[in-house]
C-alpha cells in the first residue's frame, strides 16, 4: 500500500497558502479567525 502523504511544496501552497485563502470568502473568514486567535502563522 502506498503512503498517502506525498509532500509537494507547490501543491501545499496552492491549496492552503495565503493567496488561496484570500481567493474565497470562507478563506478570508479562516484568516480573520486565525488573526483573532493571534496565530503566529496565518497560512502555510
From Swiss-Prot:
It holds the Pfam family Ribosomal_L34. PROSITE patterns: RIBOSOMAL_L34. GO terms for biological process: translation. InterPro entries: Ribosomal_bL34 (IPR000271), Ribosomal_bL34_CS (IPR020939). GO terms for cellular component: ribonucleoprotein complex; ribosome. It comes from the Bacteria. One of its GO terms (molecular function) is structural constituent of ribosome. Keywords: Ribonucleoprotein, Ribosomal protein. NCBIfam families: rpmH_bact (TIGR01030). Belongs to the bacterial ribosomal protein bL34 family. This is Large ribosomal subunit protein bL34. It comes from Hydrogenovibrio crunogenus (strain DSM 25203 / XCL-2) (Thiomicrospira crunogena). The gene is rpmH.
Amino acid at each position: 500500500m502506498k503512503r498517502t502523504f506525498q509532500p509537494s511544496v507547490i501543491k501545499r501552497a496552492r491549496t492552503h497558502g495565503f493567496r488561496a485563502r484570500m481567493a474565497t470568502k470562507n478563506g478570508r473568514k479562516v484568516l480573520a479567525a486565525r488573526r483573532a486567535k493571534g496565530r503566529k502563522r496565518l497560512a502555510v
